[in-house]
Amino acid sequence: MNLSIYLVTDDAYFKDRDLVSTIEQAIQGGITALQYRFKNKTSRQMYEELLVLRELTKRYNVELVVNDRVDLALAVSADGVHVGENDLPPDVVRKLVGDKMYIGYSVNSLEKLREVEHLPIDYIGFGSIYETSTKKDYKLVGIEALRQAVKMTSKPIIAIGGITHYRVKEVLSAGAKGIAVVSAILGFEDVKKATEELVSAYKSYYREKLYSV
């Protein structure tokens, strides 16, 4: 499971943009994982797109995660499935997928984090760390809550929400194992370049950490 640079798709960014070529640019820029998340497509549309994306991600050794739809994740042999509190409970998801794929779970408060430690999940998506324009109903948790969250759980935390290349260092310093982004990549015309800037910031943090020991 490598969710270092984790791109999450969103309907708003694909109204007049080709999905597959855009994702390929992000992959070439260096994303390590892709979460397929769409709310306004039919099951058939999503299945057909996921088949193409599964081939693409395999070719580049990038992990494919499906948001919410366990059935589609199983149908295309995704690497993981990501759910939230309004989706199927993680213990039910685990029964369905067995050990074939990992499970991610969204958490937006320290209180909820305490409740999910016992769940059969493999990573936690925690946020929103910063202000974001991607989600209208998001809850801002902040960087200090991220620091506390990392200390409260044994599960790896992937930070999400308003993360840009110049905030990568702060998020990783707080203990996040990876960064999940939408607009930091998809909000730019040059998707590959935007991805490369995130990857550069990520590598720079670990390089500095290595040499500061």
Predicted feature locations:
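A short acidic, helix-capping loop that chelates divalent metal ions and anchors anionic groups
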Residues: 73, 130-136
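Internal alpha/beta core interface subdomains
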Residues: 174-178
